[in-house]
A protein has these predicted regions:
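Mature catalytic domains of secreted/periplasmic carbohydrate-active enzymes
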Residues: 1-124
């Protein structure tokens, strides 16, 4: 992992690295700067740091739980506006970084329903 981290940072001293433990809560390597967690089933509690003192991060799919657009239609939203807003408020308030995955079709179009949901939540 050390060699991979060094290669990822080559040419940009400000790059930060994480190794994804998928749905797990463990850290692959001491050379990573933040914890890269995936929400697969539930909304776990999140604090600013994990047990190793590393910056917390959670990745969440807004629509397609399989991450990759596979059909002709976009997947429905997984969460109501209230659920997603509550999740973002709680986790970001605790200092946890959050990445939202939005389904993209083969033409490059983002799921319009997900974009509309983000616009509604932003207004709150």
């Amino acid at each position: 992992f050390d060699e991979i981290a060094l290669a990822a940072k080559a040419g940009n001293k400000d790059t930060i690295v994480s190794f994804n433990s998928q749905g797990g809560t463990f850290v692959y390597s001491p050379c990573q700067e933040y914890f890269s967690g995936e929400e697969l089933i539930y909304f776990p509690l999140c604090g600013r740091t994990n047990s190793q003192g590393m910056q917390m991060h959670i990745w969440l799919t807004m629509d397609n739980k399989w991450w990759v657009h596979q059909g002709k239609e976009f997947s429905p939203l997984r969460f109501s506006d209230e659920e997603l807003s509550r999740f973002l408020t709680r986790h970001r308030g605790d200092g946890c970084a959050v990445t939202l995955n939005v389904d993209v079709d083969r033409t490059g179009l983002l799921n319009p329903t997900a974009i509309e949901q983000l616009a509604r939540i932003k207004k709150k």
